[in-house]
Amino acid sequence: MKQLKRYFLSTVGLLMMSSTAHSQSKLDGYIAEGLTNNSVLQQKQIDVEKAMIALRIAKSNYLPTVNFSGTFSTAKGGRYSDLPVGDLLNPVYATLNQLTSSSSFPQIENQQIDFLPKNYYDAYVRTAVPLVNTDIIYNKRIEEQKTVLTQLDLTLYARQLVNDIKVAYFNYQSSVQAVGIYKKALATLEKNIALNEALIANGKGLNIHLMRAKSEWETTNAQLIQAENQQRNAQTYFNFLLNKDLSSPIENELVVADASTISTDVSNREEINLLEQSKSIQQTVLRMNELFWVPRLNAFLDLGSQGVEWEVSSKSAYYMVGVSLSIPIFNGTRNTQKVKLSEWNLKQADLAIQQTTQQLSLSVQLALNALSTATANYESSLKQLAVAEEYFHLIE
């Protein structure tokens, strides 16, 4: 988790550093707040942590596994084997008894040995370790690449979130400016109405001018109501991105972007890096599928005890060492088809990278053109505003 936090903080720092070349203290503060509190971004962080856990699981496949196993069985009947020990030894025992004038050698019966044991147990601890297994090697590499993939996905969403916060902030700024403009327009129209009423009272005005002024006031007032509603909507959406109370106030700060500071290089964009990492995963999968012919070799060691009637002694204890080898010979061409499928996936990844690069280059160029146009219109509007203010003061 500490590693994840360090990665996330570095991501936030890079995004904050690249957010603008000008001082935007208030906007930067909102961006940092959004990157910290956004619930979707927190889910992405959990995805990174899960990918790291999956990587640790893949690495653990190199380690030995230790398991305890035990069986108990009892049986009666079934296959058996006759052992004529009585027929073989009783004549000898009888002769020995005659020679020794004693009964030291009793007569014994023939024995029947059952193949199915009665009250038999076998308990052991098995330690197994893989010696040769290419699947384990490449699965670990794939999980490493998936971890990087989830980190890139986190960075990509963080960048998109920064963009959404900026757009929402600028929309809120625009709505605030629009409300201010309509309020000033209403104040000017109210002065115009009062002026026309005074002219009419002195017999120097026309009712049509007064009616037109009142009509313009009603139209502007309706536009003001609409602008105030847009301002509330912009405020609500901006606070939603920051995971705050939807009615929280927003500090307003005029920020003007500079098109000259925007980079047109898309080669290091998160979208491209994400697709490049996906391609690397496909390459690893292809290599793993191509090595389907490599044998799997495992070794094991058993330490245990076996016997009947739960007898445990030095004689019942045992150990067993062994190796297992698996060599693929034929499985219906499934492995060959997997290789072909991986090759097509790799070609598809290359095409996706090319298409995304072109789309990003196009979107950047269109955005720069739109920004240049908006900047020119803004500068022209400032000049028109200065002329209009001077004209208004002259006629006032």
What label would you give each PLM region?
Residues 1-33, 69, 78-110, 228-262:
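Terminal intrinsically disordered/low-complexity segments used for targeting and assembly
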Residues 3, 29, 53-55, 152-268, ...:
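Periplasmic alpha-helical coiled-coil/stalk elements that build and connect Gram-negative outer-membrane
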Residues 22-79, 204, 242-283, 357, ...:
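Bacterial Sec-pathway N-terminal export signals of envelope proteins
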Residues 37, 67-115, 204, 264-277, ...:
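Primarily recognizes Gram-negative and organellar outer-membrane beta-barrels
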Residues 42, 65-80, 112-118, 128-156, ...:
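Small/polar (Gly/Ser/Thr/Ala-rich) solvent-exposed segments
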Residues 43-58, 157, 163-180, 198, ...:
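Amphipathic alpha-helical coiled-coil segments
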Residues 120-122, 167, 212, 276, ...:
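Transmembrane beta-barrel architecture of outer-membrane proteins
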Residues 124-126, 169, 298, 322-324, ...:
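Membrane-embedded beta-strand positions in outer-membrane beta-barrel channels/transporters
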